[in-house]
Amino acid sequence: MLTGGIIMEFEKIVDLHCHILPGIDDGSPDLEHSLDLARAAVADGVTHILATPHHLDNNYVNHRTDVIKAVQNFQNELAAEQIALQVFPGQEVHINGDLPQRYADLLGADEKKRYMLLEFPHSNVPAYAKRLIFELQKLGTTPIIVHPERNKEIQKDLNILYDFIQHGALAQVTATSYAGGFGDHVADISRQLVENRLVQVVASDAHVLQGRNFVLSEALKQIATDFGPEQALEFESNAEDILNGLSVTANGYRKIEKKKRFIFS
């Protein structure tokens, strides 16, 4: 990958958030589409994917055992098509007050459930979110708050995310957001979150070939241009470490100072 004359090379690219499994949520509608998504991922440089279908979001329920079986079946299809992509089972878990009671049915981002993708509603941040995150931490799981840049309440006050990071959570920005696929406003927020180190990983959140495809390498290239190749490499290293259940912590994060507005007479 070229970035302003700097050559960026990844031995592997790990995508921690992807709706590639066929026909189980609002992602890929069928197997053929999933295989085409897999080819697009490989073309984008992705080598490992955490398959993260929606779970408990009022539209979809994807139980742990069902996701594991779906991943096994899909991996067999990838092998038959000679697509060099390794897929792992996960979930995008929608925040619910009873997640600790459902814990046995939840999949982590890693085999030991040290990390878990946690989705907030798009419109708000539930009042019980801090308590729930603390309860998950007591169970040994660090929540990774997904696509905070698209949450309407966080958009109005980015320091809401700062508070969660300060209390031990991690956060993931979406590649499409950073690359401008959700508009300039979301792209600007994404940049601010990266600049202030309030996100620790970037992932595709790819759903379908048209509109929400793989732009992970494009986003990493832009991040390297904006903040240096070390930042892009750190994001990818974090993704690999999370998948392997190794230690990843937020560091260097800071509050975002609101810009003062001056009225001139």
Residues covered by each model-derived region:
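An N-terminally biased module of ancient metal coordination in phosphate/nucleic-acid-related enzymes
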Residues: 1-82
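Active-site environment of divalent metal-dependent phosphoester hydrolases
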Residues: 56-59, 94-96, 150-154, 178-181, ...
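Mid-to-C-terminal alpha-helical segments outside catalytic/metal-binding sites
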Residues: 220-265
